[in-house]
Amino acid sequence: MMGEKISVIVPVYNVEAYLEKCVESILKQTYTNLEILLVNDGSTDSSGELCDQLAQRDQRIRVIHKENGGLSDARNRGIEEASSDLIGFIDSDDYIDEDMYETLYRQMLESNADLSMCGHYDVYHQIPEKQVAAIQTWELTPQEAIKMVMEAKILSVTAVNKLYKKELFEHLRFEIGKIAEDAFIMIALIHHCRKVVATNEKKYYYVHRENSITTQKFSLKFLNVIEAYEQNATIIRENYPELADVATMRLNWAYFYVLDRLLVDADFKDKVLEDRLIAYLKKNTKNILLDSRFTRARKVSFLALCLSRKLYTKILLAQTKR
């Protein structure tokens, strides 16, 4: 299929073991009118040299070497360098189905949307999840898309399994120096759309290198997750008041996310932060217990937290070892 050129931005940092598989999956796309921007973000392994070697294989590949600035900085550089009006992002340790961009472009064209999304596989130990049983496509208003993305049952906040009109980034960039960079920008991007189109068909393979939160050391950077969803809640409450409950739910989720990682790291202790996170969640007890989007297991463990954080931590550790 040949339509408008798509600029595919691939930030590269110390991924010599994964990069070739990622790039090969892009080169094999049935949608061939691509510009592939490999943004080498100051790699200290052989990734930079590998980028140059890959560029010799296909004239559609362009390599940008820069000093290390992080994932967001590399993506932003790619946006600035992109020569087309359509943009996609792929993380360099992931890979895609051969018709992902054909699917995203076709549904964008047919629906006259500004943003096109597909589903993704979570890949653990090189084994992907199953494809969805019933493939569906939706044409969505920004409000409908925000609801589906925030609920995260079908669509996700991730930047990578999507095709964007470049004009969406006219006044928006990825936040530099923070984790959860996708969560900081996605709701704002959707808010600037006239229409969004999405399919639940999985076309992107999101590779997880670590399978357990117990292997991750806690960092105060995890607080960026709360910051991102506070920012999203502000956008939603100001522009989509009907979705206030979704904003509240996702903010509660963010507090759980940070608290869980803090409690399972035996080497990091911050009683003041623990108390602040728990106090926020307890203040939202009614919202948590009455929201059907929280699982029964989450609600039971939350009730345990209200009784004893030691008990909650034991439950958490038992769950993560399964």
Predicted regions and their residues:
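Acidic helix N-cap motif at the loop->helix transition within catalytic regions
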Residues: 20, 34, 45-54, 77, ...
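Donor-binding/catalytic cores of nucleotide-activated saccharide
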Residues: 71, 92-197, 207, 211-220
